[in-house]
Amino acid sequence: METATLVAIFISGSLVSFTGYALYTAFGQPSQQLRDPFEEHGD
């Protein structure tokens, strides 16, 4: 394969992996440990 193709595939795969990890962290099991500053601030 050509070098440019491999670089494009690597960058695309990295972006997809990062996006998947970010969504898992935001909405998956680890999201239970995140704090919500709006709930901590009682009006």
Curated annotation (Swiss-Prot):
- Species of origin reads Buxus microphylla
Compartment annotation: Plastid, Chloroplast thylakoid membrane
Which family is it part of? Belongs to the PsbN family.
Q: Which GO terms describe its biological process?
A: photosynthesis
Report keywords, A-Z: Chloroplast, Membrane, Plastid, Thylakoid, Transmembrane, Transmembrane helix
The transmembrane residues are 5-27
Name of the molecule in the record: Protein PsbN
Q: What does this protein do?
A: May play a role in photosystem I and II biogenesis.
Membrane topology category? Single-pass membrane protein
Coiled coil segments of this chain: none
Which InterPro entries does the protein's record reference?
PSII_PsbN
Domain of life (superkingdom): Eukaryota
GO cellular component terms, alphabetically, are:
chloroplast thylakoid membrane
Pfam families registered for this protein in UniProt: PsbN
